[in-house]
From Swiss-Prot:
GO terms for cellular component: cytoplasm. The gene is fusA. Keywords: Cytoplasm, Elongation factor, GTP-binding, Nucleotide-binding, Protein biosynthesis. GTP binds at residues 17-24, 88-92, 142-145. Coiled coil: none annotated. This is Elongation factor G. GO terms for molecular function: GTP binding; GTPase activity; guanosine tetraphosphate binding; translation elongation factor activity. Signal peptide: none annotated. Catalyzes the GTP-dependent ribosomal translocation step during translation elongation. During this step, the ribosome changes from the pre-translocational (PRE) to the post-translocational (POST) state as the newly formed A-site-bound peptidyl-tRNA and P-site-bound deacylated tRNA move to the P and E sites, respectively. Catalyzes the coordinated movement of the two tRNA molecules, the mRNA and conformational changes in the ribosome. Its main location: cytoplasm. It comes from Acidovorax sp. (strain JS42). Gene3D superfamilies: 3.30.230.10, 3.30.70.240, Elongation Factor G (Translational Gtpase), domain 3, P-loop containing nucleotide triphosphate hydrolases, Translation factors.
Amino acid sequence: MARKTPIERYRNIGISAHIDAGKTTTTERILFYTGVTHKLGEVHDGAATTDWMEQEQERGITITSAAVTCFWKGMDMSYPEHRFNIIDTPGHVDFTIEVERSMRVLDGACMVYCAVGGVQPQSETVWRQANKYKVPRLAFVNKMDRTGANFFKVVDQIKTRLKGNPVPVVVPIGAEDNFKGVVDLLKMKAIIWDEASQGMKFEYTDIPAEVKETAEKWRENMVEAAAEASEELMNKYLDEGTLSEEDIKAGLRARTLAVEIQPMLCGTAFKNKGVQRMLDAVIDYLPSPVDIPDVEGTDPDDEEKKLARKADDGEKFSALAFKLMTDPFVGQLTFVRVYSGVLSKGDTVFNSVKGKKERIGRIVQMMANERIEVDEIRAGDIAACVGLKDVTTGETLSDVDNPIILERMVFPEPVIAQAVEPKSKADQEKMGIALSRLASEDPSFRVRTDEESGQTIIAGMGELHLEIIVDRMKREFNVEANVGKPQVAYRETVRKTVTDVDGKFVRQSGGKGQYGHVVFTLEPQEAGKGFEFVDEIKGGVVPREYIPAVQKGVEEALTSGVLAGYPVVDVKVRLTFGSYHDVDSSEQAFKMAAIFGFKEAARKANPVILEPMMAVEVETPEDYAGTVMGDLSSRRGMVQGMDDMVGGGKAIKAEVPLSEMFGYATQLRSMTQGRATYTMEFKHYAEAPRNVAEAIVAARAK
């Protein structure tokens, strides 16, 4: 079966933004104009096509990235047909993992900003993630019809807050109630959309006199940005004083793909203006799978050996599983992005991370919550596979005879935990199945059993994250559960180096005994460096075969620190000396010696408690700014700055310990009469002050 759309005409894009910037509405309009949906789905009435989980429709926020395929020929039908695979990403900070996951498999992104709210906290997080994966992007300023809308202020904020380099390719005609359309700076014509046709029809007209000067100024800015793409274009611009439409597009495209600039557009998705021009910009400026560097990976048999795969049907098959979903009708769906080669239903592929073969049952392409079965998918495609038994998010599927491991995604450690128990005994087993299924879908969500209390503990990225998990258990698996109070995920570490600490495990009372003896040096590592074990044994004083058991013992000891039993992080253990007994030594004896030795060393090395610090940003009317700052300080918060917001009001940034933030939403509402909002995301671990640490230790001792 031949390819229907040439790969050069593919665009794999994500639409990402802060909550309420109108991202889902923007995606809806895209699906409407590209002919997928016939009645526009509004988030206002809980009917948007991409928000297909029940909780999303209730809460009006997008949680899971739905992947949708659609086609576009340009708003005036002047382009050959292009195929868009659109991933709608969530805008709530508790779901950062979803954004990170989609950034990994996208080729380009459309960042949606609110013309009133401007650049908000989540916009910064998403921008950082897009930088990390070097994703070329466009910016779309939405809600131009709202009171307080200001396009140029958002342009400034992208420069100052995000350190971006925005280049408007349209400018608005009017704003607020007066927003009529945009000036296309390439054609130097006004575009006015016809409201009766829901924006399906439009006309080019002359630029209104009141925006002529603004349009000329910004056109000059755009042409200069395009000219900087190459010496040839710069010389042409200097000689002729301008550039042709083709040259401008080519220059802007080259610089967008190099992540040097971000073409910027505006409109109002809700009123059906501007999204159509943004779709043309996706074709003009965002990359196809062949415009990005070949995907790189390693050989499963030799981590040092680097491999690459071209975005080509003729290459050996490789794909990344970037999302798992449980579907009520077909069971487990595994979303994959194909980087090279062809995958047909019935094929056997190799999970190169786990070293297992998998058979592809069926392949479906998603039109939001409608699915179309296909026989095969090719390089550049995004689709869902049915029938994979043991594939987790972030794993690579490849050709059986030519395996490759693509760059793994790194998922953050959870910062908040809660005990959860089923309301009835009958639900006990169902709860276990539900939680393990949810954990395989979402790597930032963990499940474990507390050894002392026997309780099931769930951990995640924030209160909302865990709330939604419990909610999904109820809806999708019919498991009713009681949830305990949220617990902070503290950690322990050490602050000083101790040398020559003995760890001994000796049991010798007739018959075969036990003998293990190790000597450690324990030292702190810089934050975030993790655990390191160094074997410095000389002359076989601890035999080779026992060294892995020593490391295993240390790793086991790390799970429970000496102060309050929290996991120990950021330490280096050097095994420097030891002794053994010809008959009585065993792996078990050395493992026990290592556990005792590590605990002893940790007690002497000035152990401390670490607590998770959160980056908190509060947006509040100016009158309440003082109260909000005072309250953050009383929560042991460090206020780091205050910015003016586009539509008035203040954005206050602070770093606050997570333990002080429980119940903050209610407190903030009452302090500001419900007029302030806040977002919070994990920043790093920091040493807890002595009085706080003592209280934590005392609470654990009870």
